[in-house]
Amino acid sequence: MAEKIAPPRWLKPFNAVVLVARRVGLGWTRELPVLVLPGRRTGKLRHTPVSVLDLDGHRYLLAGFPGADWAANARAAGVGILAVGRRNERVRLVELAPADAEPVLRAWPVRIPQGAKIMRDAGVVPDLEPDSFAALAGRCAAFRVEAV
């Protein structure tokens, strides 16, 4: 997974603003899921807004870009906290094999259209078709979220 596509330049500052807004409880940000993982080098807790896909009774996270830092931190740590609203849930993140990731990837543009549009606009996929997302299997990490 050496390939790395840069996220849009506005994404990191936008995420920082969203995290501050969430912390003070502003509007829609209150219920925004945030993944909290230790950094793989520093051990410092890293907070990343995420989209959680509910599919067939399981929850999934998708790294929106090949080489995403949070995905590398998830691989290194294996466990973290999924914070939604005032609830903090300790979770295990299990990376899916490419074949297992395909149905999750196919569902992504249908169930998480805003995240899918960001991926398209950044050049990760050419369009919003489920087949284009399925082709990301093995390039963009997909994780099953399990309660610990």
Q: Where are each of the predicted segments found?
A:
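Short gly/pro-enriched beta-turn/loop segments at secondary-structure junctions
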Residues: W28-R30, G138
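Extreme N-terminal tail/first-helix region
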Residues: M1-L26
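Short, structured beta-strand-loop surface elements
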Residues: F65-F143
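A generic local structural motif
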Residues: L19-R22, H47-T48, E129-D131
